[in-house]
Curated annotation (Swiss-Prot):
Species of origin: Gallus gallus
Listed SMART domains: GLUCA
Propeptide position ranges: 24-80, 172-175
Family of this protein: Belongs to the glucagon family.
Alphabetized GO MF terms: neuropeptide hormone activity; peptide hormone receptor binding; pituitary adenylate cyclase activating polypeptide activity; type 1 vasoactive intestinal polypeptide receptor binding; type 2 vasoactive intestinal polypeptide receptor binding
Pfam families hit by this protein: Hormone_2
Name listed for the protein in its UniProt record: Glucagon family neuropeptides
């Protein structure tokens, strides 16, 4: 996967978290931290005035709305989701580490194969092309050695090559 795909996925993940936070932790669903005050008047999206959610000390169960902060965090961070998010984050970090290590290894191999004096930089041949060329060269060298060994064995065993000159002047070799 390319870097743009990762950036897009990360952007969507952040956007989803922000939207989730806006839905489940909007001012009408949570109670501020004790001691913190909301502005005097709070409005929702339609322009309606919302209740004051400040905690009232000494009024257990009566008078005002119950604190909803615990319920909001319970919806937003259930233990199973936290565990799943932790597993995903760990696996994602491991994947990113492997990808960066692979990219670093490829850059080191390119420097070593290309050499520091080549000066081609990014315009150098890809490593796969060099690898294929190396395989072809090795195969061709092996073939030439095998043919030389056959020729030598034929000469040693007495089956010398017979060459005939045909009418057109071509030489034909026989084993």
């Amino acid at each position: 996967m390319s870097g743009n795909v990762y950036k897009t996925l990360l952007t969507l993940l952040v956007y989803g978290l922000i939207m989730h936070c806006n839905v489940y932790c909007s001012p009408d669903r949570w109670t501020p931290v004790p001691g913190a005050k909301l502005e005097e008047e709070v409005y929702d999206e339609d322009g309606n005035t919302l209740q004051d959610f400040a905690l009232r000390a000494g009024a257990p169960g009566g008078g005002g709305p119950r604190p909803r902060w615990g319920r909001c965090t319970a919806l937003y961070y259930p233990p199973g989701k936290r565990h799943a998010d932790g597993i995903f984050s760990k696996a994602y970090r491991k994947l990113l580490g492997q990808l960066s290590a692979r990219n670093y290894l490829h850059s080191l191999m390119a420097k070593r194969v290309g050499g520091a004096s080549s000066g081609l930089g990014d315009e150098a041949e890809p490593l796969s092309k060099r690898h294929i060329d190396g395989i072809f060269t090795d195969s061709y060298s092996r073939y030439r050695k095998q043919m030389a060994v056959k020729k030598y064995l034929a000469a040693v065993l007495g089956k010398r090559y017979k060459q005939r000159v045909k009418n057109k002047g071509r030489r034909v070799a026989y084993l």
